[in-house]
């Protein structure tokens, strides 16, 4: 892709106006690109405007819009170069396509508190894949145990979203009822975690086992930490009976747990490929410095299915498949580092 020089503000505004008037306000559910889009400023601006429309992007002034357009161009160049490598995954113009990687890391990762595991909880030892008899495929979405993908926004509350996915799953499995529960309640009330500055999924799960949790529509998500309002919301909607830890650094143990219910997991999500992930089986590049909590809701012969909390404008409609079976005890992106699930009798 040839580098296209920065353009003047006046020219940018003129082209934007021309492109905007010509846009079809149809379905932009997938904003893709072709090699022709990379050949001129006008085509790039048209692509940018289509992407803005899809993701409801509004900038405060023309200077910010030009700034975001320049980042968008750089990310598109990176996406195009990466996708030509024929990896098992591909990148795309997702909701984060106008953000630099440094900005993305600051806003959307780093929300797992330093002590992301605990010695308070025991685990059942599972030595390897051959020690357990589990299905080849598991997808808790197909079994009606997973609610729609949520969006945590710029609050570092991934730990609460991760915990809630597992609570919703086990309640469905035990009772037959799928309900949405309150991430905001965990954000407000878990005093061992740090609100929007990070937290512990295991601590959130212990809170629900000790007290309970309200429905999401009773205690809706606000994206900021406030005081704990559980008493104001009336009786709890659900309660679990405990928390278990999955044996760390053991793929077989994690698969065994996922086969029984959705599981809270952590991983390293700060890389540019993770930021711009569009689909396929992700293999990295990434390390083991876990900085984000998600939920494992299934697996296949060569991947683990992850539900994220960045909305449906990222990944495979809010999901990512992470490569498994690599022989790395940490797992790709540190996925086997720290995993927990709620107990419901």
UniProtKB/Swiss-Prot annotation:
Which cysteines are disulphide-bonded?
155-196, 189-228, 286-333
Catalytic positions?
Answer: 158, 292, 308
How is this protein activated or inhibited?
Repressed by the active-site-directed cysteine protease inhibitor E64 (L-trans-epoxysuccinyl-leucylamide-(4-guanido)-butane) produced by Aspergillus japonicus. Inhibited by the inhibitor of cysteine proteases from Trypanosoma brucei (TbICP, rhodesain) and Colocasia esculenta cv. Kaohsiung no. 1 (CeCPI, tarocystatin). Repressed by leupeptin, a peptidic cysteine, serine and threonine protease inhibitor.
Domain of life of the organism encoding this protein: Eukaryota
Pfam families according to UniProt:
Inhibitor_I29, Peptidase_C1
Residue span(s) of the pro-peptide: 19-133
Question: What PROSITE patterns does this protein's entry cite?
Answer: THIOL_PROTEASE_ASN, THIOL_PROTEASE_CYS, THIOL_PROTEASE_HIS
**Which residues does the record give as E64 binding sites?**
158
UniProtKB keywords: Allergen, Disulfide bond, Hydrolase, Protease, Signal, Thiol protease, Zymogen
Belongs to which family?
Belongs to the peptidase C1 family.
Q: What role is this protein assigned? A: Cysteine proteinase with a high level of diversity in substrate specificity, an amino acid bearing a large hydrophobic side chain at the P2 position is preferred.
What this protein is called in its record is: Papain
């Amino acid at each position: 892709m040839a580098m296209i020089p920065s353009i003047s503000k006046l020219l940018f505004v003129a082209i934007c106006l021309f492109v905007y008037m010509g846009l079809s306000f149809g379905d932009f559910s997938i904003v893709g690109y072709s090699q022709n889009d990379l050949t001129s400023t006008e085509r790039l601006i048209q692509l940018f405007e289509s992407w803005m429309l899809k993701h409801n992007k509004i900038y405060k002034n023309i200077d910010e819009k030009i700034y975001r357009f320049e980042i968008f161009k750089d990310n598109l160049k990176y996406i195009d170069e990466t996708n030509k490598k024929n990896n098992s995954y591909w990148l795309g113009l997702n909701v984060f396509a106008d953000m630099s990687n440094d900005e993305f890391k600051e806003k959307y990762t780093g929300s797992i508190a330093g002590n992301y595991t605990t010695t308070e909880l025991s685990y059942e030892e599972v030595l390897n894949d051959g020690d357990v008899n589990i299905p080849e495929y598991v997808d808790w979405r197909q079994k009606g145990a997973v609610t729609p993908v949520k969006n945590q926004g710029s609050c570092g509350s991934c730990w609460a979203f991760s915990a809630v996915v597992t609570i919703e799953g086990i309640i469905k499995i035990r009772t037959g009822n799928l309900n949405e529960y309150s991430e905001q309640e965990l954000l407000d009330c878990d005093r061992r975690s740090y609100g929007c500055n990070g937290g512990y999924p295991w601590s959130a799960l212990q809170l629900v086992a000790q007290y309970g949790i309200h429905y999401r529509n009773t205690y809706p998500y606000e994206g900021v930490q406030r005081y704990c309002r559980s008493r104001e919301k009336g009786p709890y909607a659900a309660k679990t009976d405990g928390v278990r830890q999955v044996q760390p650094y053991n793929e077989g143990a994690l698969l065994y747990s996922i086969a029984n219910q959705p599981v809270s997991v952590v991983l390293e999500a700060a890389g540019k490929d993770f930021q711009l992930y569009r689909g396929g089986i992700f293999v990295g590049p990434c390390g083991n410095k876990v900085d984000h909590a998600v939920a494992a809701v299934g697996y296949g012969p060569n991947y683990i299915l992850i539900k994220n909390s960045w909305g449906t404008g990222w990944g495979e409609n809010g999901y990512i498949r992470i490569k498994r079976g690599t022989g790395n005890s940490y797992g790709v992106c540190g996925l086997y580092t720290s995993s927990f699930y709620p107990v419901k009798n």
